[in-house]
Amino acid sequence: MIYRANKPEEAIKSQINKEKHGIDFVDAQNLWRDENALIIPANIVDEEIRYALISKFQNKCYIAIFTLRSDIYRIISVRRCRKNEEKNYEKDNGPRV
C-alpha cells in the first residue's frame, strides 16, 4: 500500500500538493510502477528516515519524498524533477553495454 487518505489532513495535503506541483498523491502512486525508478535515502526527520523516489509518470520525471510506516509508504511531497535529478535518472537508466 502506498497512499491512503485515512485522515482529512492527508486528503488536504494531497490537494495542496496538486495545486502547487500539478500532481496529487493518488496519481503519484504510479511512480512506484516505473521499473527504472531510483530510491535513495534523503534525510532523517525526528528519527524517521525519509527517501527520495525519482521516477517517470506520463513521460514526466518526478521526485517523491516518502517514509515507510507500518508497511505503508507515506508520501510527504511530490514535485517535478529538477534538471540534475532528471539527469541522475537518465544516467542510471541509460543504454546498457
Where are these regions (language model features)?
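Ribonuclease/tRNase effector modules and their secretory precursors
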Residues: 1-97
